[in-house]
Swiss-Prot record:
Gene name as annotated: GT13
Protein known as: Probable xyloglucan galactosyltransferase GT13
Annotated tissue distribution: Expressed in roots, hypocotyls, cotyledons, leaves, stems, petals and carpels.
Cytoplasmic topological domain residue ranges: 1-18
Its job: Functions in xyloglucan synthesis by adding side chains to the xylosylated glucan backbone. Involved in the galactosylation of hemicellulose xyloglucan.
An example molecular function term from Gene Ontology annotations: glycosyltransferase activity
PANTHER family referenced in this protein's UniProt entry, alphabetically: EXOSTOSIN HEPARAN SULFATE GLYCOSYLTRANSFERASE -RELATED, XYLOGLUCAN GALACTOSYLTRANSFERASE GT13-RELATED
Family per record: Belongs to the glycosyltransferase 47 family.
Top-rank taxon, per record: Eukaryota
First-listed, main subcellular location of the protein, grouped into a coarse class: Golgi
Keyword Transferase part of the UniProt annotation: yes
Glycosylation sites: 53, 116, 153, 240, 412
Origin species: Arabidopsis thaliana
Record-annotated membrane-spanning stretches: 19-35
Bilayer topology: Single-pass type II membrane protein
Length: 468
């Protein structure tokens, strides 16, 4: 048998790169093409007696539409997911989240009788509006993956491996407990993954998981009980795994995906209908703020934002989340405020990002950011690179010192520019929602889930090319 010839493989790859330069393909095509060429190069470097075991699947006589898109989902022991939500009521820190687990993590459905004006605010007759909790993403994502059109039970066909670990529920249930308890399940999972044959393929670099918490919850620096969170993402195994979370620490293996909103449509037609409703809204307020003050946070600008809003003589709507009315937990009231506003203020809260950002965009309201970490440095897969197309940025420092009048600044934005920005915001809507699982064909939407999976596939393809 002839020996493997690396020089011959290198020559083939050089020719492939020349072809790619000449045809100027899209980035995704380039990655998949290079991967294919690398396989051919390896094949040519072997003797006639040694061939690759390549399986090409077809559908109804045509090419396989899932080629390069297959995902294998680990069948984890129930202690890593199902048991965590079955025992929800047993943990004080989780009890107020239990009611949101129904309907595949979307929560209870919003009904017409919940408000006398629900039908004016929401497209309620479609049955696609829910009381969705912002931390339910891992449950939602797992259910979506179960219906993913390119899910396979044959890991040899898969391009990536999904790990359906409910990391957020795990870290939350032991909030304030000792670090041994907080770290135990993550370390158990790391060992379980190491022992799987799928792990040895790329030692985790083709694995990913999703969490409904912020990234810092999984990067505890010390082993002091007083320190925050657990150390899941500091384990050697998880340094290779890609984590998708609602907010990242800008690490190379962390990527931000949208917070869940209240809207989970089934079809493209339904989304377009909602976009038309958003376009036709008559907006009474120049700007609005839905949130609470943060008096104990010295760096917070929320107090100044609330002061300016209340002083605007009716041009700003403030929905106070620091009261016992629970209005901010009511999707109808929250969405109604955003529908009535041209601009929606999105200052940082406990962390730089906010679920409110996505609720306001859903309502067609132009977001106003005060920190680059609220969206621009986070959700790069979902928003235009040019932030001026869809948002307004006001530096925190000027607001904090009282040097910036938010009202005057926003009032100076021309009607023409507002129209362009709103049009861009409405285009973003399908990208930041999580649709009902199972839709295929022309009515299928490239939602937040589909975009995330596609980007993970691209990322793993790049890893594979660098290993060749």
């Amino acid at each position: 048998m002839d020996k493997f010839n690396p020089k011959k493989e290198k020559t083939v790859k050089k020719r492939a790169l020349k072809v790619l330069t000449e045809i100027s393909p899209t980035p995704l095509f380039s990655m998949l093409f290079l991967l294919h060429i690398s396989q051919i190069a390896t094949y040519l470097s072997l003797s006639d007696k040694e061939t690759l075991n390549i399986t090409v699947k077809t559908k109804q006589g045509g090419t396989d539409t899932c080629a390069g898109r297959y995902v294998y989902m680990h069948n984890l022991p129930s202690r890593f997911n199902e048991d965590l939500i079955k025992s929800c009521e047993a943990y004080i820190e989780l009890r107020n989240k239990c009611k949101y687990l129904i309907n595949s993590g979307f929560g209870p459905r919003i009904l017409e009788e919940d408000h006398n004006h629900t039908t004016r605010v929401l497209t309620i007759e479609t049955g696609s509006w829910y009381y969705t909790n912002q931390f339910m993403l891992e449950v939602i994502f797992r259910e979506k993956m179960r219906h993913y059109e390119c899910l396979t039970n044959d890991s040899s066909l898969s391009s990536v491996v999904f790990v359906p670990f409910y990391a957020g529920f795990d870290v939350r249930r032991f909030w304030g407990y000792n670090v041994k308890l907080r770290d135990e399940l993550g370390e158990d999972l790391a060992q379980w993954l190491r022992e799987r044959p799928e792990w040895r393929k790329m030692y985790g670099r083709d694995h990913f998981f999703v969490t409904g918490r912020v990234g810092r919850d999984f990067r505890r620096v010390t082993d002091q009980d007083s320190d925050w969170g657990n150390k899941l993402m500091r384990l050697p195994e998880f340094e290779n795994i890609t984590m998708l979370s609602i907010e990242t620490n800008s690490r190379s293996n962390e990527f931000a995906v949208p917070y869940p909103t209240y809207f989970h449509p089934k079809s493209r037609t339904e989304v377009k209908r909602w976009q038309r409703q958003v376009t036709m809204m008559q907006r009474r307020y120049l700007f609005s703020f839905v949130g609470a003050n943060r008096p104990k946070m010295e760096e917070s600008i929320r107090g100044e934002i609330i002061r300016q809003c209340l002083a605007s003589q009716g041009r700003c709507k403030f929905l106070d989340c620091d009261t016992s009315s629970k209005d901010c937990s009511d999707p109808v009231k929250v969405v109604e405020v955003f529908q009535d506003s041209v601009f929606c203020l999105q200052p940082p809260g406990d962390t730089p990002t906010r679920r409110s950002t996505f609720d306001s965009i859903l309502a067609g309201c132009i977001p106003v950011f005060f920190s680059v970490d609220s969206v621009y440095n986070q959700y790069k897969w979902y928003f235009p690179k040019d932030r001026t197309k869809y948002s307004v940025y006001i530096a925190e420092e000027g607001v904090k010192k009282g040097k910036v009048s938010i009202e005057k600044l926003l009032a100076n934005v021309s009607e023409e520019k507002i129209s362009r920005m709103r049009n861009e915001v409405e285009k973003i809507i399908p990208k930041i929602i999580y649709t009902k699982p199972g839709e295929v064909g022309p009515e299928k939407i490239e939602d937040a889930f589909e975009i995330a999976v596609a980007r993970v596939l691209e990322r793993v393809s790049l890893f594979k090319m660098t290993r060749i």
